[in-house]
UniProtKB/Swiss-Prot annotation:
This is Chaperone protein DnaJ. Gene3D superfamilies: DnaJ domain, Heat shock protein DnaJ, cysteine-rich domain, Urease metallochaperone UreE, N-terminal domain. Its main location: cytoplasm. Belongs to the DnaJ family. The gene is dnaJ. The lineage of its organism: Bacteria, Pseudomonadati, Pseudomonadota, Gammaproteobacteria, Pasteurellales. The J domain is necessary and sufficient to stimulate DnaK ATPase activity. Zinc center 1 plays an important role in the autonomous, DnaK-independent chaperone activity of DnaJ. Zinc center 2 is essential for interaction with DnaK and for DnaJ activity. CXXCXGXG motif repeats lie at residues 147-154, 164-171, 186-193, 200-207. Homodimer. It comes from the Bacteria. NCBIfam families: DnaJ_bact, PRK10767.1. Its cofactor is Zn(2+). Zn(2+) 2 binds at C164, C167, C186, C189. Binds 2 Zn(2+) ions per monomer. It holds the Pfam family DnaJ_C.
């Protein structure tokens, strides 16, 4: 009887991702597990098919061989690479596991692998002021915690917990398929290495339950968008009582209506009046520490930069603060009265003529350049 396509068994397309394969396996294995379908031969066979499919598709090397050669890659006595003999079905994975296990303190069988829980991610948005000064934020995360009823064992109190007879407590099965030595999660105990007489009613034998947890996160001064804060042991609890993973808080700093940040420096545009630009004066500039006086020299133009040292963001590494860089924008007056317009006309007239290059050198230079351009253009037409 021809074997079914492994992707078809898991209800997937050939290009399925690792996560999709893992999710499909967990869903189908739970649905067709013998404990939930006692006495059903059909469910038992389906369960075996699911585990066999995942054993291949869940391993990158074996999946690549299957995609290229199909089931022939795992047949005894040969396969894709032309190897013969099949070594009489000996399980070399177990053989080497036992040898090296003895050398390093323990056999290859009977040892359950302790796998800590999953790492979690939490995206946290803060203001620029909070990023610069540092703050403490209260957050709530969705996580997996060890079941309080069974202490993470997955068994009802007083229930027998025995070593899984299929994997001998290791939680994994090794076998040879063709020229591959495979290792997969034990289909009987799902990797726990244990056989539970009565599963915990609270967690249904999983040992973990979904939970909302409130945490207080200290944000150090100087953080920026993309920085990650690691909270060790605040991730999901591990299976079978294993330690929890970590929580990574990813920082996102909101845009500010005045300042722009580039590393440890802050930038802002400072508008000044036409008169202040021409005559000079003193203005107030906003900083994250409050208002600061800034002297504007006479004849200041738009685009002039003023650097206020130490008014930026303190580096999380060196502790030294960057600078605040102010870019001047000379504001053109609007909504003028007739009298104000008349005064500006008189000022304009007084600046024209022979003294234009003295009072407005850029305008004078521009007009001279335009005149020369058209003069040369006229000569080339002749």
């Amino acid at each position: 009887m021809a074997k079914k396509d492994y992707y078809e068994v898991l209800g997937l397309q050939k290009g399925a991702s690792e996560d999709e394969i893992k999710r499909a396996y967990k869903r189908l294995a739970s649905k067709h597990h013998p404990d939930k379908n006692q006495g059903s031969k059909e469910a038992e066979e389906k369960f075996k098919e699911i585990n066999e499919a995942y054993e291949v598709l869940g391993d990158d090397q074996k999946r690549a061989a299957y995609d290229q050669y199909g089931h022939a890659a795992f047949e005894q006595g040969g396969g894709a690479g032309g190897f013969g003999g099949g070594f009489g079905g000996a399980d070399f994975g177990d053989m080497f596991g036992d040898i090296f296990g003895d050398i390093f303190g323990g056999g290859g069988r009977g040892r359950q692998r302790v796998v800590r829980g999953e790492d979690l991610r939490y995206d946290l948005e803060i203001s620029l002021e909070e990023a610069v000064k540092g703050t403490t934020k209260d957050i709530q995360i969705n996580t997996l915690a060890h079941c309080d009823s069974c202490g993470g064992s997955g068994a009802e109190k007083g229930s027998k917990v025995e070593t899984c007879p299929h994997c001998h407590g290791s939680g994994r099965i090794r076998r040879q398929q063709g020229f591959f030595v495979s290792e997969s999660i034990c289909p009987t105990c799902h990797g726990s290495g244990k056989k539970i007489e009565k599963p915990c009613r609270n967690c249904h034998g999983e040992g973990r339950v979904h939970k909302k947890e409130n945490l207080s996160v200290k944000i150090p001064a100087g953080v920026d968008t993309g920085n990650q804060l690691r909270l060790a042991g605040k991730g999901a609890a591990g299976e079978n009582g294993a330690p929890a993973g970590d929580l990574y808080v990813v920082i996102h700093v909101r845009e500010h209506n005045i300042f722009e940040r580039d590393g440890s420096n802050l930038y802002c545009e400072v508008p000044i009046s036409f008169a202040t630009a021409a005559l000079g004066g003193e203005i107030e500039v906003p900083t994250l520490d409050g208002r600061v006086k800034l002297k504007i020299p006479a004849e200041t133009q738009t685009g002039k930069l003023f650097r206020m040292r130490g008014k930026g963001v303190a580096s999380t590494r060196s502790g030294y603060a960057g600078d605040l860089i102010c870019r001047i924008v000379v504001e053109t007056p609007v909504n003028l009265t007739s009298e104000q317009k008349e005064l500006l006309h008189k000022l304009e007239e007084s600046l024209q003529g022979k003294d234009l290059s003295k009072h407005a050198p850029k305008s004078s230079g521009f007009l001279d350049g335009v005149k020369k351009f058209f003069d040369n253009l006229g000569k080339s037409d002749k």
